[in-house]
């Protein structure tokens, strides 16, 4: 529905985070490379910071028209919210994308898992086969920024099986869908300089549309049947949090891969921590 940049934006939002500079916390700065079938098509810059009880995020992504699949496009996302126990409770979410002359905008306010205020441009087009959005589809949900922030019982990888054992209820302004995660494996990745080096938890994912979608669309049916979806999670230094290190989405043109080439966590008033951050 949103074009190539929308697909990329929906994926790069899986890297999260930040709070006010005055708060004591951990800052995570990351660069994600975006490729399709092994060809680099873009990048995303993420600056994030976490405390025990809060997060916010600023994410800037860009794709380049290196092939017929992608045009020059940009995406800007931001979000913030609270961390309570093992729950992520977003309070605001903003999205802006531009691909040629086509633009999208989302402004969303939330409280305790419920959308309290929403502005979306463009609005969903009217089609007889579109599953309508009802008021209940805006309740007990998270936005795409908060969707893949996983709270663990202690800093580090922890119990990988437990981390992946979840269904994430997402509302993005246009659609309500579930992302069902399942544990695949725990593995070690190696990085040099300021790249991540350490263990990651690999979760498989399935897309389950709930409302706002059209099952008559080939793209919707493809994503429902797509079994080549993965998220690799890495721990944030000294925090009970996992964030995506690598995202894989199988497409008809080859795998869309978003991977962190830079992953630097810094405690407030401390030197940057690179490499193994468990």
Could you describe each region identified by the protein language model?
Residues 135-174:
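Extracytoplasmic beta-rich ectodomain segments of secreted or membrane-anchored proteins
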């Amino acid at each position: 529905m949103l074009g190539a940049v929308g697909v990329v934006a929906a994926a790069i939002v899986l890297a999260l985070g930040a709070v006010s500079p005055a708060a004591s916390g951990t800052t995570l700065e990351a660069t994600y490379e975006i490729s399709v079938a092994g060809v680099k098509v873009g990048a995303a810059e993420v600056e994030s910071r976490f405390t025990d009880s809060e997060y916010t995020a600023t994410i800037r992504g860009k794709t380049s028209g290196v092939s017929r699949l992608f045009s020059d496009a940009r995406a800007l996302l931001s979000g913030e919210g609270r961390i309570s126990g093992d729950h992520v409770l977003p309070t605001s979410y903003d999205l802006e994308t531009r691909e040629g002359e086509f633009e999208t905008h989302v402004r969303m306010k939330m409280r305790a898992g419920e959308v309290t205020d929403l502005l979306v441009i463009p609005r969903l087009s009217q089609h007889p086969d579109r599953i309508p959005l009802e008021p209940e589809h805006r309740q007990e949900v998270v936005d795409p920024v908060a969707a893949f922030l996983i709270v663990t019982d202690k800093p580090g990888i922890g119990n990988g099986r437990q981390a992946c054992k979840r269904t994430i209820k997402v509302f993005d302004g246009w659609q309500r869908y579930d992302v069902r995660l399942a544990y695949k494996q725990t593995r070690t990745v190696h990085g040099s300089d300021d790249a991540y080096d350490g263990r990651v938890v690999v979760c498989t994912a399935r897309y389950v549309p709930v409302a706002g979608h059209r099952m008559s669309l080939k793209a919707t049916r493809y994503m429902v049947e797509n079994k080549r979806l993965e998220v690799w999670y890495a721990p944030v230094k000294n925090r009970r949090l996992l964030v995506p290190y690598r995202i894989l989405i199988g497409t008809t043109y080859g795998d869309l891969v978003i991977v962190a080439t830079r992953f630097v966590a810094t405690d407030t008033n401390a030197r940057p921590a690179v490499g193994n951050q468990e």
